Regions:
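Short connector loops at helix/strand junctions that flank enzyme active sites
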Residues: 81-83, 129, 144
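Short, flexible, solvent-exposed loop/turn segments with mixed acidic/basic and small polar residues
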Residues: 70-80
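Surface-exposed, low-hydrophobicity interaction/linker segments
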Residues: 24-71
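Residue(s) in the substrate-gating loop at a strand-loop-helix junction
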Residues: 88
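Hydrophobic side chains in well-ordered alpha-helices
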Residues: 43, 96-102
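An acidic, glycine-/histidine-flanked metal-binding catalytic module
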Residues: 1-37, 143-217
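Helix N-cap motif at beta-to-alpha junctions
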Residues: 91-95
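Short Gly/Thr-rich strand-loop-strand
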Residues: 103, 108-139
């Protein structure tokens, strides 16, 4: 199917404004999402990591794309970074940056470039989220498709997954909500747990113990 970036972005505007798409627009929207699967094929051809790492790929759900477009100050549809997402789970801090460097060596080339990094390891989000995000762009039929690779430790992944599960069980929105999460007891609890895990990974057991005592007393 032929598509242009201009048409894709117009579809994104209609979605943002909650205007129904016609059948041709819906088909183009579906196609634009679907072609991002090509990135996974290219990734596995170029990248062969050790079995000690866990690698997971996912294509962003249609509902999640729509929700992202309808947020305040959202990106254009063609510029969304994580329609194609790859997550690599490693064992410790050092491996995060080792894998990061290796990915750049293996992926960057004629049709793939690194756009930027978001280092939430060195600068965690206010809610305690920690991970290294690498945003790449892949050229397909003279059009750029963005994709995101997240690299995190097992403990960081445990924290993030626990937040998601809590959201599902309690019908909360701690993961992606735009409200001040730290004004809720749950948000403050998970932030402190993240700090405990960070100290533990840095082998700062004294600080970890003090913070655990603060959380549970």
């Amino acid at each position: 199917m032929e598509y242009t970036i201009s048409k894709i972005n117009k579809i994104g505007v209609k979605i943002k404004e909650s205007i129904a798409l016609n059948s041709d627009e819906q088909e183009m929207f579906n196609y634009f999402r679907k072609i991002h699967e090509l990135i996974f094929e290219k990734f596995y051809k170029k990248v062969n990591l050790s079995d000690k790492y866990t690698i997971v790929t996912r294509l962003k759900r249609m509902e999640s794309i729509i929700n992202k477009l309808q947020r305040p100050n959202s990106s254009k549809l063609s510029r969304i970074d994580d329609i194609a997402g790859i997550r690599i789970i490693v064992n410790n801090f050092n491996e995060i940056y080792e894998v990061s460097e290796l990915l750049e060596k293996l992926l960057i080339g004629n049709n793939c470039q690194l756009k930027y990094n978001k280092d939430y390891i060195k600068s965690p989000k206010k809610d305690g989220y920690r991970s290294l995000h690498k945003i790449f762009t892949f050229n397909y039929e003279n059009k750029n498709l963005n994709f995101e690779i997240q690299i995190r430790t097992k403990l960081q992944h445990l924290w993030s997954t626990t937040v998601e599960i809590y959201d599902l069980i309690e019908y909360k929105n701690l993961k992606s909500g735009s409200f001040n999460k730290l004004k809720t007891w749950e948000g403050l609890f998970f932030k402190r747990c993240s700090k405990v895990m960070e100290n533990f990974e840095k082998e700062d057991f004294i600080s970890s113990k003090k913070l655990v005592n603060k959380i549970f007393t």
